[in-house]
Amino acid sequence: MRYYQGSECTFTNLFVWRRCYRICWAISHEFLIIKVTRNDITFVLQPFGGDDKDLPAVIEELKKTFAGKSIEMRGIYEESIPLLKRCLTETTQFAEDRDNWDYVYLRDNLANLAGRKYHAKKNHANAFRKENPDYVFSAISEADITDCIAFADLWCEMKGQNEEGLRCELCALEEALNNFKNLNIRGALIRINGIVQAFTIGEKYNDDMAVIHF
């Protein structure tokens, strides 16, 4: 079971969201087990690593841990389903979790915005350039962190800081910014009249993929 292409598998993702989602982990038969609690729902991610032959023992340990309660597993890769079905009971239900699918784009498509599919995005970008001819786009450096955090705080306040989901996202975002160098992540920002108006944070995932966290 070594099909780890999802954004939830990055250390950065697990680290910055650990408080909001009460993320904890354990090792069982060389498998990494990640437990998450979100909106009072507790679930585990697909077990990572280990030898396929040991997965049934891991499932049995999970059953004991959940003390007879149903186990909800998320972040399952399509390639893993046949193996999981062999380890689980016939009453186990599998369902698509489309709301949590990752969006996957080719770099060249986003860089060029060619074709009808990206027409609206290209128009939006062109309108922004026309309205803000003096905007400055640059990579985020440590000198920009304070300004980015201030902008994130303002964004949360404008969106409704009392909403739990926004407070959670702000907490994760500030974790990423405050640990920018240690996490080895990268980012870019836009300033208009010297003031940060937008930024993004991501990291290289493997040889042919990057993950955009925010």
Question: Predicted segment positions?
Answer:
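Hydrophobic, proline/glycine-rich low-complexity stretches
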Residues: 1-6
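Amphipathic coiled-coil/heptad-repeat helices and related helical stalk/stem segments
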Residues: 55, 121, 172-173
